[in-house]
């Protein structure tokens, strides 16, 4: 309907083009996910099926949007980092965030049975999303460090909380009151002395979250026998707060 008398309504649209030459982070979060996990009988404090499904949905997002150089996930959230030179949807914030969150949600629903089997999906989940800009490499590393530190803090608290509720028979309010004002050392001591749980021995995924990135792997051609290095998307549960990770995989932030 080009050049029609109604075309003026386009002038009401607000421009939302993101700044050039900065890292774009699209962070998605589950909306009312506590209710969703309760309705679908998620194990507490961590449900391996749910975490694996989140990782799978995020992996498919990374395949669909190759401008994503690294992604980090914990619980019901995922952060996708798009390279500085990304020109996806001409860097329109609303288009980028809505496309990524809708694709993530569709993959979550589509692949539900792969991870939950005959456990029925009673209603689809909802995720919100936003774009945040980070100008420097140090900023983006600090952002990812913040999310991984948050993973540890939340998981330590939840591990203690559910141990008190499920193993010690505390009510939710009693468990909250007992944990109020405690620090990491106290929580670790509680887990070990009262529940024989060594927090450091829990799966790394629970404590460190999930990192998706392109990792160099050696592949051998079956016909020629020649081996060459290729980059493949992998999901790992590693420390990204220390510089060791970034020194081992410098190409991640070199993808500008």
From Swiss-Prot:
Gene3D superfamilies: 3.30.70.3000. It catalyses: a 5'-end ribonucleotide-tRNA(His) + GTP + ATP + H2O = a 5'-end phospho-guanosine-ribonucleotide-tRNA(His) + AMP + 2 diphosphate + H(+). Keywords: Cytoplasm, GTP-binding, Magnesium, Metal-binding, Nucleotide-binding, Nucleotidyltransferase, Transferase, tRNA processing. Its cofactor is Mg(2+). GTP binds at residues 29-34, 75-76. The keyword Cytoplasm applies. Mg(2+) 2 binds at residues 29, 76. Its main location: cytoplasm. GO terms for cellular component: cytoplasm; cytosol. It comes from the Eukaryota. Signal peptide: none annotated. InterPro entries: Thg1_C_dom, tRNAHis_GuaTrfase_cat, tRNAHis_GuaTrfase_Thg1, tRNAHis_GuaTrfase_Thg1_sf. GO terms for molecular function: 3'-5' RNA polymerase activity; GTP binding; magnesium ion binding; tRNA guanylyltransferase activity. Its EC number is 2.7.7.79. Adds a GMP to the 5'-end of tRNA(His) after transcription and RNase P cleavage. Belongs to the tRNA(His) guanylyltransferase family. This is Probable tRNA(His) guanylyltransferase. It comes from Dictyostelium discoideum (Social amoeba). The lineage of its organism: Eukaryota, Amoebozoa, Evosea, Eumycetozoa, Dictyostelia.
